């Protein structure tokens, strides 16, 4: 992930091909019930349910050898969130406030909350260490004011998620802002 770039889909035909050939193929790898549960947990700020679903997905879908770096988890989360493009503009590694957030969901509908996700990864982390990292991630969102972009777009309700990974384990802290 050394070279990041923003890609725009130039027209509806290309967007359709992208949706049908790429996103739907990826989405088929995740049971629909799991994808729906992950989405509902995100929309409601249910950190425990989101943790349970993500951990189950990690246990059943990935190799322990794949999971060493934050960039792996970033790609996994970005892939999961890409299927929400009908409800959200999914943004990754953008500058906002006084820093750069990991993931941002800018709602396309007024009734949906804005969502900011800050990811952390550690090798051989304990449950307590992961919980602390997740709390630190939420604090980072607040201190660096990552929600400025959402607020400027008129988003009134914003959820902050701190997500800490270690191997196939995950801890999540969420907070309404």
Put a short name on every predicted segment.
Residues 149-177:
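Domain-level recognition of nuclease-like catalytic cores that cleave nucleotide substrates
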Residues 1-145, 173-177:
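Extended alpha-helical interface modules used as scaffolds for assembling large macromolecular complexes
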């Amino acid at each position: 992930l050394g070279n990041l770039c923003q890609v725009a889909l130039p027209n509806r035909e290309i967007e359709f091909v992208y949706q049908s050939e790429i996103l739907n193929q990826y989405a088929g790898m995740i049971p629909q019930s799991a994808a729906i549960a992950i989405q509902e947990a995100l929309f409601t700020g249910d950190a425990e349910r989101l943790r349970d679903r993500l951990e189950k997905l990690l246990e059943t879908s990935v190799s322990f050898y794949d999971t060493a770096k934050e960039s792996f988890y970033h790609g996994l989360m970005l892939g999961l969130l890409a299927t929400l493009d009908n409800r959200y503009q999914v943004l990754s590694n953008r500058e906002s406030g006084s820093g750069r957030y990991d993931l941002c969901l800018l709602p396309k509908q007024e009734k949906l909350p804005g969502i900011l996700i800050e990811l952390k990864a550690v090798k051989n982390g304990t449950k307590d260490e992961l919980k602390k990292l997740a709390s630190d991630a939420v604090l980072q969102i607040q201190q660096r004011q990552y929600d400025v972009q959402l607020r400027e777009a008129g988003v009134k309700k914003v959820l902050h998620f701190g997500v800490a990974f270690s191997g196939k384990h995950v801890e999540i802290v969420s907070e309404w802002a």
